[in-house]
Amino acid sequence: MTERDTTHFGYKQVPVTEKESHVAKVFDSVAAKYDLMNDLMSMGIHRLWKRFTIDKSGVRAGASVLDIAGGTGDLTKKFSRLVGPSGKVVLADINASMLQVGRNQLLDHGYGDNIEFVQANAEALPFPDNSFDCVSIAFGLRNVTDKDQALREMQRVLRPGGRLLVLEFSKPTNPIVSKAYDVYSFSALPLMGSLVAQDSESYRYLAESIRMHPDQETLKSMMEQAGLCLCKYYNLTSGVVALHTGVKA
């Protein structure tokens, strides 16, 4: 089997054709406790990262937004308020379990009039060219098998002048933070997953997938190669997370 035939699933090398199913099993397992675990793992800081993302989105009333890997709907909820009744937000997720949790939570909280729910693969988005004013993907790109293809798809469905937002775990810029983060990721996260979600292996994969994700400069270059311009990134919490932005010319 050649290098082109395999890809990483955490630290493991698996056939390209199998990664999607491996990732699906992880998110089928964690869907019900996903929001609780996010709060515990980040001590609530993920809400600040997402708020920063919204602030950088430039989304206004009447806009059309695609939230890829939208999961339980954190960003979708915020975009829904911004675009208002004249706008539209599409929450897309490849995982049916996550999509169902997101749909239920949003509808239970009175959202839905301007939201569509679509099960979709980021590598083959089921939307026409030039469909959206903004495309976001938060903590989802690292789980995609072919990240370059996914970025090309995001660029394709953006309207000219539209903005892509990629919020993802990245590489800490402070050596002390980096060392502490490693200890936390590989010790505390699996333990927390075992105690709260009865699933340590999925959270071990989370830690490994973060380490395998491209660093800030590499992801910026990948976005440029996908056809986006004005690409930049913002390091959050000493680079533990980075928000990358790019614009379609």
Curated annotation (Swiss-Prot):
Instruction: Please list the reactions this protein catalyses.
Output: a 2-demethylmenaquinol + S-adenosyl-L-methionine = a menaquinol + S-adenosyl-L-homocysteine + H(+); a 2-methoxy-6-(all-trans-polyprenyl)benzene-1,4-diol + S-adenosyl-L-methionine = a 5-methoxy-2-methyl-3-(all-trans-polyprenyl)benzene-1,4-diol + S-adenosyl-L-homocysteine + H(+)
Q: Name one GO biological process term.
A: aerobic respiration
| Pathway the protein contributes to | Quinol/quinone metabolism; menaquinone biosynthesis; menaquinol from 1,4-dihydroxy-2-naphthoate: step 2/2; Cofactor biosynthesis; ubiquinone biosynthesis
Return the EC number: 2.1.1.163, 2.1.1.201
EC category: transferase
Keyword set, alphabetical order: Menaquinone biosynthesis, Methyltransferase, S-adenosyl-L-methionine, Transferase, Ubiquinone biosynthesis
Q: Does the keyword Phosphoprotein apply?
A: no
Spell out the InterPro entries in the cross-references.
Answer: SAM-dependent_MTases_sf, UbiE/COQ5_MeTrFase, UbiE/COQ5_MeTrFase_CS
Q: What does this protein do?
A: Methyltransferase required for the conversion of demethylmenaquinol (DMKH2) to menaquinol (MKH2) and the conversion of 2-polyprenyl-6-methoxy-1,4-benzoquinol (DDMQH2) to 2-polyprenyl-3-methyl-6-methoxy-1,4-benzoquinol (DMQH2).
Concerning its family, UniProt says: Belongs to the class I-like SAM-binding methyltransferase superfamily. MenG/UbiE family.
Q: What protein is this chain from?
A: Ubiquinone/menaquinone biosynthesis C-methyltransferase UbiE
Q: Which organism is it from?
A: Hahella chejuensis (strain KCTC 2396)
